[in-house]
Amino acid sequence: MTTLKTICFAVTTAALAGCAATPRHYDDESSRALNLARAGGIYDQDLRDSPDGTRSYRKSLLMGALNLASLATSLDAPLRHLTGTQTLLFNATDIMMTPDNPSARPSLMGWMPASLAASEDDAYDHYVAVVDEAITQASESMAITATKLTDVKTPEIDGHPLMLWSVTAERYGCTDDNCIIAYNIQQPNHWKTPSYVIGGEAASYNIAANHPEKYSRLVFRQSGHELTFPVDEFYSAVSAALSSWIVMYFSPNTVIQDGEPLPYPVLYEQGQKLMFKEPDHE
């Protein structure tokens, strides 16, 4: 399995390297969502446009890593009992366990203007500050309380820790720390920005979704059997507060809307939820 991952990543990396001299061009025959996803490194062909956007994924994602009931069960013990314990570490690791294919997992993708940072390390710090501020603004706009957990040890991805936030919102069933936000930012790389990325510059510090393990993500999880938190609204609010050059991709069954998981993929850009819908039908 490790060898297969390495081979697949090498093939994808080679494809990306071939495009390094010029940024990816916009494909008028694809939706904006698909153009942004492809630019962000989601190249596998399980993801594609469909006439109405609800049949844009080729495979069933009813697997353990993305099964919301399974994920919720793993978080049943409230965080107030887990802080600093191996169980919290297990829960954080569980959130990280997603499929190899980029289209099958939630991902953050970004093209931070190179003028905003002096180095890749500086760019990482800037990304973290942007995401933290977006979570804070989104929480305030929805009148919920989100607290960043700084006293817990979490797994690292690409040399950087997984960030955890505890959410309190009694009207949505978030009490006793049973709701969390988890995100991570991989080490940004120098890249070229596609012209259709809003607010971008020609050169950027990029976080992409193509690596089998070292990719960025932001997910909300609510434990228990009743998924009452408006995750779709929260993701939209976070996206609206993020810089315009960051987009959020979610695979089927990972976004909760009206208490039910959406069975199709979506991408959030500037607060808008984009579907993978053929341009002729948009």
Show where each model-derived region lies.
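Sec-dependent bacterial lipoprotein signal peptides
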Residues: 1-21
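Short non-domain terminal segments
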Residues: 5-7, 24, 39-41, 45
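Generic hydrophobic secondary-structure signal
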Residues: 7-8, 16, 27, 74, ...
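Bacterial Sec signal peptide processing site at the extreme N-terminus
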Residues: 18-38
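Mature extracytoplasmic/lumenal regions of exported proteins
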Residues: 38-77, 87, 91-282
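Compositionally biased, intrinsically disordered low-complexity regions enriched for acidic
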Residues: 82-86
